[in-house]
Amino acid sequence: DSMCLLDLLDRWCRERDGRVVAAHFNHQLRGAEADRDETFVRDWCAAHDIAFVSSSGDVRGLMEREGLSLEEAARRLRYDFLRQEAEKLGQHIKIYTAHHADDNAETILFNLIRGTGVAGLTGMAYQQNGICRPLLDVTREELAAYAAARHIPHVEDTTNADPGAAARNFLRLEVMPRLRQINPRAVE
């Protein structure tokens, strides 16, 4: 997903004499696999003349200190890093994330399960607090087709295939496929 977004943004910026900066946060939760992911993105950016910045943080430490879930601690550190990098680049810099329609459907369902009420039905905003999510209308399947057509490589986070690794994974791997059986357009 993020590699597709990086390709799209890079193409868009080059057509307008702009530039994109790829920012990668290593959560240090998956050992050598996480380091491999960072190296993969760094090398791809170098091969495509895209600026690259990265950082890492102690997600488990923040989780324990502040009583956060693993996902929330990781999100907080990641977005803090992204905001710091954006501030370094200038006042009008935007942060783009590769959240897509499937992610948004999962978010809405997750919000309902947590009891957020009507406010949770809106899902993620296309743009909020300097964060832009241009792919919210694009499905995971459409992104995979784009990646294949453009020969965009990617690496898999193996924890994404484990429904027990996080509540969101359970929704993605167990619940969403069942919802699609009821309504194939459940994500739309």
How should these model regions be labeled?
Residues D1-P177:
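Core alpha/beta nucleotide-donor-binding catalytic domains of modification enzymes
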Residues L179-E188:
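An accessory alpha-helical subdomain
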